[in-house]
Design a protein with these regions (language model features):
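Glycine-rich, aromatic-flanked loop segments that form ligand/cofactor-binding clefts
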Residues: 74-80, 103-141, 172, 209
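Boundary/entry segment of secreted carbohydrate-active catalytic domains
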Residues: 27-64, 68, 288-290
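Active-site-adjacent "subsite" loops/lids of carbohydrate-active enzymes
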Residues: 38-55, 112-113, 123-166, 305-308
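Catalytic domains of carbohydrate-active enzymes, especially glycoside hydrolases
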Residues: 61-86, 165-171, 239-245, 311-318
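Aromatic-lined carbohydrate-recognition surfaces of secreted/lumenal glycan-active proteins
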Residues: 49, 121-131, 172, 192-233, ...
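Aromatic-lined carbohydrate-binding/catalytic grooves of carbohydrate-active enzymes
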Residues: 73-104, 335
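Active-site groove signature of glycoside hydrolases
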Residues: 75-83, 144-146, 155-187
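Substrate-binding cleft of secreted/luminal carbohydrate-active enzymes
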Residues: 243-268, 274, 279-341
């Protein structure tokens, strides 16, 4: 049944792409991995996040194409390994195959040339240490694997090395942290060291082959993060030293302070001001598009527009939009994209 489902999904993906994307030149349809092409710059990019299944949906593809044609987005962030532990393509990494994590849902060697032909900058999103499949295999009960676990390190490094050959412009690591929980305290230095060590290995292996970026909790931008007391183990200074871009997830709904819950502009402003004092690495934030904890009297459209204004006003090097179900209708309204589901 799994093989039949995968075959159907691949057929639908090919059909949707051929139907809803404009014809490309002959060179763009080559099956040769596009990693051999000149590396594109990631500066100033504006994009949306897509799940592997999002690429198989007609309505989502239509919206993405209309936004690209209108010149409002130029970047796609696509799952290559998600927080279920699933690898979205047919991986050759032995452990991915042994675990049954390799789904073969998407054929990036075919899809990437087509998407590049439409002018998209392509970011591969790899979830790292939140991996229920690997956690179960290694005997961890909470769906997470420690960043210091040798098998977790080797496995994720192997996936990253493989992804670097598929033709993406950039590889972005998400959930590159420990599980949240517990108060701020000393005693987490080993966690910071483990994450820094993993990124150093990645940089040494593929840093000259593909642009690298990391997703960070929004609170990592605050000055107190430099004290290294956060149980998640993310340090802005450490992590930014190994990558080309950092993407703090500046979702107002996730903050505890009411002024930030009610102030989408303020969240982005304060995070950018604080973060730029601590790192010279380009900051390209993720902005909230999902409808959660929107302040009374404010529309989701106004909420999104405020985030965008702050990102522009305070020197973000582009920005990315996050909606977990890939429903970007509100965003398209804000951007002035004429599109209807």
């Amino acid at each position: 049944m799994g093989r039949r489902k995968t075959t159907l999904c691949l057929f639908l993906a090919a059909a949707f792409v051929s139907l809803f994307f404009l014809p490309t030149d002959r060179g763009a349809t080559s099956q040769t991995p596009s990693a051999a092409a000149p590396r594109l710059t990631g500066h100033g990019r504006v994009g949306v996040y897509l799940t592997a299944y999002g690429l198989l949906r007609e309505d989502i593809l239509r919206g993405v194409l209309e936004a690209r044609k209108a010149g409002k987005i130029d970047t796609l962030v696509i799952n290559v390994k998600d927080n279920h532990g699933d690898v979205s393509y047919a991986s050759s990494v032995p452990l991915a195959r042994a675990l049954g994590a390799s789904t073969g849902l998407l054929d990036f060697r075919k899809l990437i040339p087509i998407l590049r032909g439409q002018g998209f900058y392509l970011i591969a999103r790899q979830v790292v240490f939140n991996d229920p499949i690997l956690a179960k295999h290694l005997g961890y009960s909470n769906g997470w694997v420690p960043a210091a676990d040798p098998t977790a390190i080797a496995y994720n490094l192997a996936i990253a090395e493989e992804v670097a050959t598929l033709g993406f412009d950039e590889l972005q690591f998400d959930y590159i942290r420990y599980a949240d929980g517990g108060g701020l305290a000393s005693g987490y230095e080993a966690r910071y060291t483990a994450i820094d060590s993993f990124l150093a290995k990645v940089e040494a292996s593929i840093g000259n082959k593909i642009t690298l970026s990391v997703d960070l909790f929004g609170r990592v931008m605050w000055d107190w993060n430099a004290r290294r007391t956060d149980p998640i183990g993310q340090s802005l200074e450490d992590m930014s030293a190994h990558v080309d871009y950092v993407s703090p997830m500046l979702y107002p709904s996730h903050y505890t302070e009411q002024k930030y819950k009610d102030g989408p502009y303020l969240v982005v402003k304060d995070a950018m001001v604080s973060g730029k004092k601590r790192t010279s690495t380009a900051i390209r934030p993720f902005l909230q598009v999902f409808d959660m904890a929107i302040p009374a009297g404010m529309t989701i459209d106004a909420y999104i527009a405020a985030e965008i204004r702050a990102a522009k006003d305070y020197g973000a090097d582009g920005y990315l939009f996050w909606e977990p179900s890939n429903d970007y209708r509100a965003l398209y309204r804000v951007l002035g994209v004429s599109y209807a589901y």
